[in-house]
Structures are given as C-alpha cells and as structure tokens.
Amino acid sequence: MFRWGIIFLVIALIAAALGFGGLAGTAAGAAKIVFVVGIILFLLSLFTGRKRP
C-alpha cells in the first residue's frame, strides 16, 4: 500500500514539475487516499493481530 502511495506521489511531483496541473492534482489525491487506506489497514492489523491460541 505504501509503495503505491509513494508511486502516486512521485508521479504527482513529476507532473507538477512539467506543468501538468490536472494530472498532478489527480495523482496527489490518489496518493493521499492510498496512504490513508494503508494507515487504516496497518492500525487494524495492529489491534486485531495474531492472538495466542
């Protein structure tokens, strides 16, 4: 999940540097969503992790 977030962030930075404003905004939004979902899944797995039998 975090890898996808970083990939979208890099795409957004490259698009912003080249002047593609719409594409940069879309990629940055996707990066934020993927990052937040990754954090939520991490916290869920942390709290509901492997329990002793």
Swiss-Prot record:
Any idea where this protein resides?
Cell membrane
- Protein name listed in UniProt: UPF0391 membrane protein PC1_0455
Q: Which GO terms describe its cellular component?
A: plasma membrane
What keyword terms does UniProt attach to this protein? Cell membrane, Membrane, Transmembrane, Transmembrane helix
What is its membrane topology?
Multi-pass membrane protein
Output the InterPro entries linked to this UniProt entry: DUF1328
What family does the entry list?
A: Belongs to the UPF0391 family.
- Judging by the UniProt lineage, the source's domain of life is Bacteria
User: Source species, please?
Assistant: Pectobacterium carotovorum subsp. carotovorum (strain PC1)
Q: Where is it mostly found?
A: membrane
The transmembrane residues are 4-24, 30-47
